[in-house]
Amino acid sequence: MKRIPEPFRIKMVENIRMTTRAEREKALEEAGYNPFLLPSDAVYIDLLTDSGTGAMSDRQWAGIMMGDEAYAGSRNYYHLCDKVNELIGYQYTIPTHQGRGAEQILFPTLIARKKAQGGATHPVFISNFHFDTTAAHVELNGAKAINVVTSKAFDTTTYYDWKGDFDIDELEKTIAEHGADNVVAIITTVTCNSSGGQPISLANMKAVYEIAKQHDIPVVIDSARFCENAWFIKQREKGYENKSVKQIVKEMYQYGDMLTMSAKKDPLVNIGGLCCFRDDEDLFNEVRTRCVPMEGFVTYGGLAGRDMEALAIGLEEGMNEGYLAYRINQVAYLGNRLRDAGIPIQYPTGGHAVFVDAKLLLPHIPGEQFPAHALNNELYLEAGIRSVEIGSLLLGRDPKTGKQKPSPMELLRLTIPRRVYTNDHMDYVVEAFISLKERIPQIKGLTFTYEPSVLRHFVARLKPIK
């Protein structure tokens, strides 16, 4: 049997309400044509993000009741540290309120360390593909974010197993161009969100790590979707088909020195993050000094004890192979149905979302008028479905020139929350696209009425171009 049903029983439900077209038009106008600013009650199916939007298990809810809310030395912190060491193999753990909390205490410490060694006169971070908040933290600290993902990622119509891989030649060229002394860190993003939730192979992770070690550059693994990446390795990479996901995860983290993690994704919690170190106690201690004023005391990092307990449990649940098979299958189900309906997507589908290629679907709208965001708005008006643009709007402007950064792709991300929606919901999404497809030529681009200078896509306000 190819179909994989939900590997869980539903114990509690939350009612959702379908709005009228007139209600949606009014809500979108009041939100400045930015679905980020819509109230959730105005949304029928919410595919904005998989971050913190999943459903926790009965075991996680039981863990919530075991929260130790001591300011210092919570037992839940020690349980979390033990789980990180057991499952990932890293010795030192700092909890944070979410992934960007880890970035805001780690990145400036890495830059300061590099400068203390006589480098980082023109600091850069290199990644397969920085996500938006990661790039923002790099740039806010005066460094430059450089992406060197494989060019195969930009051909959305052609199948390739590893569209999250680094372009190894481009990585070496970039290090040589900027000088190893200026490369603060290499960030390996698993899976690679901005290229379509696409996996990176273990062979590529290993090659990147070996290059980094040759130049004495630390490797940070951006770990939001590490379980999904491990599942793809098990399914696609030769020699790993008989390895367990847990074994693959352990090997993945051998090719990094530290990690940042938004635990709101694969570890299945609503809030939380991690900043962990394999064996560098000195760096761990330096970062902890930033944790106290920025996130909170080092044994809670902005989290309640109950949330750390749910996270410790979720780290293991996220590696469950029955769950991962269902999870990846549901994403593929939506993607395959959209392709059958003639909707172009990033192919093959990735781990957490289906990415519609708005550049192909709306060729009449140029990148600077945000075709994927325009499609996002139309999908909401059509069916009450909220999704998110991954393209020119998200990429933003060059901080030095103020000009729009050229985006290689204009994608609409249909992000599926974990253990929340059934395939009936996915069928509804497909039907909305089929209905919407008929009026694609009439969709107009957008322009700003308010544009923030940093991470503009979150709170920008726009209007349709007449």
UniProtKB/Swiss-Prot annotation:
Pathway: Amino-acid degradation; L-tryptophan degradation via pyruvate pathway; indole and pyruvate from L-tryptophan: step 1/1. The modification N6-(pyridoxal phosphate)lysine is found at residue 265. GO terms for molecular function: tryptophanase activity. Gene3D superfamilies: Aspartate Aminotransferase, domain 1, Type I PLP-dependent aspartate aminotransferase-like (Major domain). Its cofactor is pyridoxal 5'-phosphate. It catalyses: L-tryptophan + H2O = indole + pyruvate + NH4(+). Homotetramer. This is Tryptophanase. It comes from Photorhabdus laumondii subsp. laumondii (strain DSM 15139 / CIP 105565 / TT01).
